[in-house]
Structure formats: structure tokens, C-alpha cells
Amino acid sequence: MQRVLGTAIVTVWMVVLAGTGWADMGKTAPALKAAPGSKAEAHLKEGIEHYNQGHFDVALKHFMAGAKEDPQSAEAHYNVALALDKTGDHKAATEHFKTAYDLGKNNPDIQNSGILKAHLKMK
């Protein structure tokens, strides 16, 4: 009886945690490569390497350089937003997610991004 009750309690907690997003804590949304022909390509490539290693502050510098080089790059703004989120600047991250969303209408990775939708309070 105690074993069944214990299993039931664990199962309920797993469902609760999954529903609140806590089950995904610690996961990092992937940074995006530049669109073909983008002037930001070299900066984003370097930034992605640092981002994947958890060097979010260094990645941010590269992503910002990419966004400056190609202000119309949705991927650059998206990556800036990811790095800003990781470094704790959520207000600025939200601004860059909005820009990425507006510029990236044809990019399903951006349009369907969970973290972007959370920042923009979308469903």
C-alpha cells in the first residue's frame, strides 16, 4: 500500500512540474545560424560556439556584433535575446525577441520558439 501511494505521489509531482515548465529548467534554447548570405554569419557562428559552451556574456558580444552588421537578421536578434535572457537582462531580451519575431515571419524556429513566446506572452 505504501509503495502504491509513494508511486502515486511521485507521478502527481511529475505532472505538476511538467505543467509549470520546471521539468525543462536547465535546458538551453538553441541559438540559430544566420540565414544564407547574411552579413552576420561569421559573428553568429563564433557566438554560437561560445553560447553552446555556456559563455553567454562572450556569446552576447558576438551576437550583438552580428545584429549591428546585419540589423535585418532575425536570427541575430533572436540570438541576442537568448544571450540577454541567460545573462539576466530580461527586459532587453524581450525587445530583441520582438524584433526577431517581426523580422523572422518565415522562420518557423523563431515563430514557434517557446522562450520567445514566453517573453512576448504568447500562447
Predicted feature residues:
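Register position in tetratricopeptide repeats
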Residues: N52-Q53, K86-T87, H119-K123
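Canonical tetratricopeptide repeat
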Residues: K45, N79, S113-G114
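Conserved structural position within tetratricopeptide repeats
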Residues: M64-K68, D102
